[in-house]
Amino acid sequence: MTHPSTVRRPIQVEHVAIEATKSFEAVKAALEALVPPLDPAISEALRRGDIVRANEALYRGPELAIFSARDHGGLLRTAGLVRKTVQYEIGNPLTATEMTRHQLPTALYAPLRVLLYENEAGRAVFEYDRPSSLFGQFGDERVTAVGRELDAKLESVLVKAAG
């Protein structure tokens, strides 16, 4: 009888924190103004199998979109804590396919997770893992190059929202 095999290997990830000069509410509003939600027409077209319409929506979309936003602060309230924090999934479906066409496991990290929270000093902070360090683990320069492009795009929009 055969058994499933498991492979484990350590990876090194570069973690980034950006402390804002504005309040949590102002930074959240700025981010959501700069990065729109993912166009629901994309998912709807894919669900219907309408690849032409999905591609039209994808190609007219923004460089980055918010796939989801989770109010982690709401969850913390169940533990009796009051914290302002939102976890975002941010990315671009076309960018994701540039990587997954070469290395399907990159889908583990696309879209990217970004955490926005208010720290103890009352300042808003973004934290995320640098895309090129996540995607670099796959050892495919085509994927790592896309990760480096994402490094610049993500940092640029977060710094703009934070400032």
What is each PLM-predicted segment?
Residues E63-L64, L134, E141:
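Conserved NAD+-utilizing ADP-ribose enzyme module
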